[in-house]
């Protein structure tokens, strides 16, 4: 309990906050994770669906899988953990601080919840990217895969980062800078196994940030964390960011 109180106090006083989220934060919204016992990679081989080589071999198969995932995402809604991070951003910015949320998720739920200072490190399922001209465009509610580019008419691919691909231009630099400069770093719902995102917590710790981890299972970050909340994202965020009387009166975190 002492450590939790210390973490709350540090968060209240923090001026530069960086947050990393993974699949665990969207699990309560009904979005499958990848690596736990019920995760996507238990039933699907990532080499068959999430690599440039898989797409080159069988784009129809890959698009059919992504169309299924897109449908799951469109049915999902942000959960209290997403909204808690929106509220945290509001609090930090209202006192003149800086805030950046970096997510490995491609479901778009952080943006839907209202997060503003956001880096989608691995792209977004609800967008496509032209294979020829590189134009990114939102996918319509109903589309027959594969979609085609509205600018040049060429076939488009999912606008996500596959295994073996580079991150979106500028995304990593922005994320790395925020964690290197943070005085408080929060890592929520990630196994901390996928690089380079997994290194962000280590970067923050090495730079002197107070590091908090929220995850049901231990991760490689656990030995470094000043506080590890061994619980789910919704419960962990409620512990870390309880509503103030003012927030309750104004309807924040509802």
UniProtKB/Swiss-Prot annotation:
GO cellular component: cytoplasm
Chain residues that bind substrate: 66, 69
Catalysed reactions listed for this entry: N(6)-acetyl-L-lysyl-[protein] + NAD(+) + H2O = 2''-O-acetyl-ADP-D-ribose + nicotinamide + L-lysyl-[protein]; N(6)-succinyl-L-lysyl-[protein] + NAD(+) + H2O = 2''-O-succinyl-ADP-D-ribose + nicotinamide + L-lysyl-[protein]
Positions of the catalytic residues: 122
MF terms (GO), sorted A to Z: histone deacetylase activity, NAD-dependent; NAD+ binding; protein-malonyllysine demalonylase activity; protein-succinyllysine desuccinylase activity; zinc ion binding
Main localization of the protein described in the UniProt heading: cytoplasm
Cofactor: Zn(2+)
Keywords, sorted A to Z: Cytoplasm, Metal-binding, NAD, Transferase, Zinc
Catalytic class of the enzyme: transferase
Keyword Cytoplasm attributed: yes
Domain Deacetylase sirtuin-type intervals: 1-250
Record-listed E.C. numbers: 2.3.1.286
Binding residues for NAD(+): 22-41, 104-107, 189-191, 215-217, 233
Binding residues annotated for Zn(2+), in chain numbering: 130, 133, 149, 152
One Pfam family per UniProt: SIR2
UniProt cofactor note: Binds 1 zinc ion per subunit.
Cellular location(s): Cytoplasm
PROSITE patterns: SIRTUIN
Protein family: Belongs to the sirtuin family. Class III subfamily.
Role of this protein: NAD-dependent lysine deacetylase and desuccinylase that specifically removes acetyl and succinyl groups on target proteins. Modulates the activities of several proteins which are inactive in their acylated form.
Notes concerning its domains: 2 residues (Tyr-66 and Arg-69) present in a large hydrophobic pocket are probably involved in substrate specificity. They are important for desuccinylation activity, but dispensable for deacetylation activity.
Name of this chain's protein: NAD-dependent protein deacylase
Taxonomy of the source species: Bacteria, Thermotogati, Deinococcota, Deinococci, Thermales
Name of the gene: cobB
């Amino acid at each position: 309990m002492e450590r939790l109180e210390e973490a709350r106090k540090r968060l209240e006083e923090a001026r530069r906050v960086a947050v990393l989220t993974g699949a665990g934060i969207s699990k309560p919204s009904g979005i499958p994770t990848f690596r736990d016992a019920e995760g996507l990679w238990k039933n699907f081989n990532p080499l068959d669906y999430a690599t440039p080589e898989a797409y080159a071999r069988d784009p129809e198969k890959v698009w059919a899988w992504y169309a299924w995932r897109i449908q799951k995402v469109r049915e999902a809604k942000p959960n209290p953990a997403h909204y808690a991070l929106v509220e945290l951003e509001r609090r930090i910015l209202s006192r003149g601080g800086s805030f950046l949320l970096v997510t490995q998720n491609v479901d778009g739920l952080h943006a839907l919840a209202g997060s503003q200072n956001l880096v989608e490190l691995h792209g977004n399922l609800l967008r496509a990217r032209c294979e020829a001209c590189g134009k990114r465009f939102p996918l319509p509610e109903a589309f027959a895969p594969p979609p085609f580019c509205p600018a040049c008419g060429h076939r488009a691919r999912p606008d996500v980062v596959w295994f073996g691909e580079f991150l979106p231009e500028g995304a990593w630099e922005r994320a790395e800078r925020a964690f290197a400069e943070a005085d408080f770093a929060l890592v929520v719902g990630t196994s901390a196994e996928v690089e380079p995102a997994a290194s962000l917590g280590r970067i923050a710790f090495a730079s002197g940030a107070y590091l908090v981890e929220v995850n049901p299972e231990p991760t490689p970050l656990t030995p470094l964390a000043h506080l590890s909340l061994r619980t789910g994202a919704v419960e962990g965020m409620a512990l870390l960011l309880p509503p103030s009387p003012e927030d309750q009166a104004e309807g924040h975190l509802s």
